[in-house]
């Protein structure tokens, strides 16, 4: 905890405080180097954070980028992961219409880059949910963009490096 704040609150309210907490992790990250979620929060009228971790569900709500109350343990869960729901602020955005296809394309790319995790997009207006999960990561991405094209090689050449500190093995 920093300044009597949970790590989640620090990440939500401080630039460059992303979930990696060190520069080395960003060598293999598909994120925005610790500014993404704090900027979303800063530009939102309301934001809800739900964290599923170690068998517990934690909740914190924000209004105009400020926490309404501290992070609270809110029951048990068998899930893992984080859910962010937000409403952009009309102070910063004139048009609050989302380009769903653009958002879905970016989430799909993130799912390829972060193989083995599920990323979900829910359209609250239509109720339609889209999930992205790719165990094969970049291999699946290459196979998808090749679609019906002729491969140069029968099998895709792929190296999955192990990164430890500043060293790649």
What are these regions (language model features)?
Residues 1, 150-159:
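Core mixed alpha/beta domains of very large multi-subunit molecular machines
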Residues 1-7, 18-144:
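GHKL-type ATPase core
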Residues 11:
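Short basic (Lys/Arg) and small-residue
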Residues 14-15:
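Mobile ATP-lid/nucleotide-binding loop of the nucleotide-binding subdomain
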Residues 157, 164-169:
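GHKL/Bergerat-fold ATPase module
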């Amino acid at each position: 905890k920093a300044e009597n704040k949970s790590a989640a609150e620090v990440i939500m309210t401080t630039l460059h405080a992303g979930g990696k907490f060190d520069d080395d992790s960003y060598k293999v990250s598909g994120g925005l180097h610790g500014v993404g979620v704090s900027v979303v929060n800063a530009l939102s009228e309301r934001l809800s954070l739900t964290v599923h971790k170690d068998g517990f569900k934690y909740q914190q709500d924000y209004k105009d980028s400020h926490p309404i109350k501290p992070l609270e343990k809110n029951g048990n869960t068998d899930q893992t992961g984080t859910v962010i729901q937000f409403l952009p602020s009309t102070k910063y955005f004139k048009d609050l219409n989302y380009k769903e296809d653009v958002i879905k394309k970016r989430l799909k790319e993130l799912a390829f880059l972060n193989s083995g995790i599920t990323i979900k997009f829910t359209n609250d207006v239509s109720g339609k949910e889209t999930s992205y999960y790719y165990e094969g990561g970049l291999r699946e991405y290459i196979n998808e963009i090749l679609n019906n094209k002729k491969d140069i090689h029968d099998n895709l050449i792929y190296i999955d490096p192990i990164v430890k500190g500043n060293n790649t093995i």
